[in-house]
C-alpha cells in the first residue's frame, strides 16, 4: 500500500518519492490517488488562505495564485488533459482520428478555450470560498481525484493505444469506488455553511466528471490519460463553483 501511495504521489505531483520509479501507475496507485488529492487540497486551501490575508477576502488574486500553485505542483498534468480532450471532442472523424489529434503536441482553439475557462472558473470559485468556507477548496480538489477512481471502475475500457488507459481503466472494484464515494460524501458535510451544501456540490461534480468520461468512452472507444485528467479538472471546477454558489444562499 505504501508503495502504491508513493507511486500515486510521484505520478500526480512533483514530489520525488523513494522506490516509485519501480512501480508503474496501475490499480494500487489509482486506488490511492484520492489521498494525493486530499494532500493537494490541503495545500490549495493553505495557499488560498494566505492569499486572502495578503490580497483581501474574495480577491481573485488569491484564487488565481492557488490555481497557479496547483498547476506547478501537479506539473500541469491534468490541465494538459483538458486541452487534449477538448481538441479530441472537437474533431470530426472516427475515434482513431480524434485520438491522433489528442496525441498531437499542438493545442487547438477548443483546447485553449477549455483551459482558460477551467483556470478562470477555479480561480474565481477558490477566491469566493476563502470567505464562505475554505474547506470547500480541499473538498473540490479531493472530489476530482475520487472521480478518477470512479472513471476507472470495472468494465470501463481503455482507448486503443493509450498507455496509461491500459494500466488503469477497469481496475477499480465496486467496493473501492463505493468506499471513496462514501468518504467524499462524509467529509463534504462540514465543508459548507450548511451541512447539505457540500454533499450536493460533490454529487453534481462527480456526476459531471463521470458523464464526461462516459461520453469520451463512446467517442474515443475508451479511457485515456487525457480523459482522466479532464474528468479530474471538470469535477474539481464543478465542485468549487457549485459550493461557492450554494454557500451564498
Swiss-Prot record:
It comes from Mycobacterium tuberculosis (strain ATCC 25177 / H37Ra). It catalyses: alpha-ribazole + adenosylcob(III)inamide-GDP = adenosylcob(III)alamin + GMP + H(+); alpha-ribazole 5'-phosphate + adenosylcob(III)inamide-GDP = adenosylcob(III)alamin 5'-phosphate + GMP + H(+). Pathway: Cofactor biosynthesis; adenosylcobalamin biosynthesis; adenosylcobalamin from cob(II)yrinate a,c-diamide: step 7/7. This is Adenosylcobinamide-GDP ribazoletransferase. It is found in: Cell membrane. It holds the Pfam family CobS. The keyword Flavoprotein does not apply. Keywords: Cell membrane, Cobalamin biosynthesis, Magnesium, Membrane, Transferase, Transmembrane, Transmembrane helix. The chain crosses the membrane at residues 32-52, 109-129, 132-152, 173-193, 198-218. Its EC number is 2.7.8.26. Joins adenosylcobinamide-GDP and alpha-ribazole to generate adenosylcobalamin (Ado-cobalamin). Also synthesizes adenosylcobalamin 5'-phosphate from adenosylcobinamide-GDP and alpha-ribazole 5'-phosphate. GO terms for cellular component: plasma membrane. GO terms for molecular function: adenosylcobinamide-GDP ribazoletransferase activity; cobalamin 5'-phosphate synthase activity. It is a multi-pass membrane protein. The lineage of its organism: Bacteria, Bacillati, Actinomycetota, Actinomycetes, Mycobacteriales. Belongs to the CobS family. GO terms for biological process: cobalamin biosynthetic process. Its cofactor is Mg(2+).
